Design a protein with these regions (language model features):
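Catalytic donor/gating beta->alpha subdomain of glycosyltransferases that bind UDP-sugars
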Residues: 116, 184-247
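Glycine-rich, basic loop-to-helix element that forms the pyrophosphate-binding segment
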Residues: 72-90, 111
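Conserved donor NDP-sugar-binding/catalytic core segment of glycosyltransferases
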Residues: 106-138
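Short beta-strand-to-loop acidic/aromatic patch adjacent to the donor-nucleotide binding site
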Residues: 92-103
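Short, acidic, metal-binding catalytic loop of nucleotide-sugar glycosyltransferases
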Residues: 29-39
Length: 340
């Protein structure tokens, strides 16, 4: 793709963030080539950071008119992107979403634009590689990069380029984003999958590219990992209930984990009640042993524990949302409109 073709379209690069002083500088620096090669602006949509994030971004903005700091009063990522599009997206062709906790190749945005122009896709999504630094992070990364942790999700498995119905959000036509109403701001988790559901329903096409990808760093401790996946489970449940969709087979297996754990408590009455839970735990531990022996990875056993935490938290969050909605949902619940 020629530089003229790239610069013929205008891109809005949005970075949702909250208290990212440790990362935001390197993220913006990494986008320097994108600002040179593309007709693009960067909007850092900040949810009220109390560390040095805002002052760092303000410094960049004072030095470069292509960088802007924007307030996000709602603090959540879905609203961060919506408000950026509403404020700065009117004359832009493409929205590019950048995560403050990720690492990206220097030509990431350029590759996305090339793929969008070459395929005519309405959305371009990317694969995600998880990398750890601490021992627990390395174990969690091993789990998340394996079928034990991702269930064979293609955007986690390095699949070749293909048309898909969901992936890690990277680029989207502003016109498509606006037409379907942007992100649903009632979603604090799983807003990307929920938007992709509406995108597909409206007839738009999503392209998974293998020409670029991002690196993600998982949570470094047990409790943050549990909370993250508990939130993912709740978000996925809300998505299914909103669109009256059904879980896939890949999702059904971890969905059963929390009920199995509750059922195992009945072992005090009859020991056979613990068998299903024991089978699941044994399968996870066996897979971890295979990772350790078959792939000669010393973090295999700990990866099994990380996967069990993710499975249980995701399942618990899912059922918490389902049961909570059944008890609390009124006969009619209006959807909160996005701020675009």
């Amino acid at each position: 793709m020629t530089s003229e073709s790239r610069r013929a379209v205008r891109c809005l690069i949005v970075i949702p963030c909250l208290n990212e002083a440790r990362h935001i500088e390197s993220v913006i620096d990494n986008l320097a080539d994108a600002l040179l090669d593309l007709n693009a602006v960067i909007v850092v949509s900040d949810g009220g950071s109390t560390d040095e994030t805002r002052s760092i971004v303000a410094r960049y903005a004072s030095d470069n008119p292509k960088v802007t700091l924007l307030d996000n009063p709602q603090r959540i990522q879905s609203a961060a992107v919506n408000i950026a599009v509403a404020t700065y997206g009117a004359d832009c062709d493409y929205l590019i979403r950048i995560d403050a906790h990720g690492d990206y190749p220097a030509d990431y945005c350029q590759r996305l634009v090339d793929e969008a122009l070459a395929t005519g896709a309405d959305s371009v999504v990317v694969g995600m590689r998880t990398i750890g630094i601490s021992p627990f992070q390395k174990a969690t990364a091993l789990a998340q990069n394996s079928k034990l942790g991702n269930g064979g999700s293609r955007h986690r498995m390095g699949a070749a380029s293909h048309w898909t119905d969901h992936g890690h959000h990277a680029l989207m036509k502003i016109s498509a984003f606006r037409q379907i109403g942007g992100y649903d701001e009632t979603f604090q988790h799983n807003e990307d999958a929920e938007l992709d559901y509406r995108l597909n329903a409206a007839g738009y096409r999503i392209w998974m590219t293998d020409k670029t990808s991002m690196v993600y760093y998982p949570r470094a401790k047990v409790l943050p990992l549990f909370r993250q996946y508990f939130g993912y489970g709740r978000g996925r449940a809300r998505n299914f209930m909103k669109h009256r969709a059904r879980p896939s087979l890949r999702q059904m297996i971890p969905l059963s984990v929390a009920p199995l754990a509750v059922g195992a408590l009945l072992a005090v009455i009859n020991w056979t009640a613990a068998i299903p839970f024991a089978v699941w735990a044994g399968a996870c531990l066996a897979y971890g042993a295979w990772l350790a022996l078959g792939q000669r990875n010393p973090y295999g056993p700990l990866a099994a524990i990380s996967a069990m935490i993710m499975h249980f938290a995701w399942s618990a969050g899912f059922w918490r949302e389902v049961l909570g909605q059944k008890k609390a949902t009124p006969a009619y619940m209006p959807r909160k409109e996005p701020s675009i």
